[in-house]
Amino acid sequence: MVITKTPFRMSFFGGGTDIKEFYSEYGGSVLSSTFDKYCYVTSRFLPEFFDYFSEFVYSRTERVTDIDKIEHPLIRNCMKFMNLQNIRLAYDADLPARTGLGTSSSFAVGMLNAFHALKGEMCNKKELADEAIYIERVLCNESGGIQDQIAASYGGFNRIDMSEDGYQVKPIILPKQRKKELNDSLMLFFTGFTHMSSTVQNGVKENFSDKIRRLQTMKSMVDDAQNILIKGSHLSDFGKMLHETWKLKKSLSSIISNSDIDDMYQSAIKAGAEGGKLLGSGGGGFLLFYVDKDKQKYVREALKNLLYIPFNFENDGTRIIYYDE
């Protein structure tokens, strides 16, 4: 039996520049961090005396006798890619799926990590990220970028640069107290809405040539945000930049936000938030705000109908927390 633990991520700047149509020509950059909310994948070989060859437990339970009959596309393609059968797999998570935290990619990375361990194989972080990207984007044919798989695999607070030739993961090195100050100034709220990121990504790709300049601006903001963090500028400038990138992001597609989300956002700004954004591709999920500590109680009151999620940054990425041959 193998149990893996894989973090979710929050993307601050550069989201959208990690889609192949953009980074292969212009280069992409993302500033993101994983945090201490996780998905857990428990996997083991299933004895052959059952009347089904594999069982998968997630939001529903599947018992199948043929790999092609697995309904969950990610599980089906991971099983085929790893050439596995007679598997029992269970998925658990701290936060719901389809909420802009890279949950499906964390599942993919955690599942691959577990499957490799079941086969007695060591697999490094880059291999896991590359395999998850291939399975989600090629085998599952889902629209989207590549930052989520990289973040889930590597973990930590990173700048990820992407080009036609590949990607580089560069840790953002900050004094412990400054990183804590940033962490303590960020507030996460669940809107109650979920979304399919591939649907939103398809909306972004419509009339894509008209959006190149805005994506280039969003990419340049990664440099600006990194400079704020490492050069000792006031961290409230980071919050103000979140507001600017959110405005740009909304302009990419009409389905990224809606009137309810806009109202929530404006309520937080009026209560004292410097800025914020909807995490992930858009359409629902989690709102992240930068709020000075003395104003956080007012923002919580303004958004009292939303679930507030305290969190801490994490550095480990996917890992095996239980292994028994």
Predicted regions and their residues:
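N-terminal pre-triad scaffold of radical SAM enzymes
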Residues: 89-97
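Short aromatic-hydrophobic micro-motifs that form the base-stacking/packing surface
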Residues: 99, 277
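Short glycine/proline-enriched turns and hinge-like loops at secondary-structure junctions
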Residues: 23-25, 102-103, 143-144
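DPxDG-like acidic metal-binding loop motif
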Residues: 101-121, 125
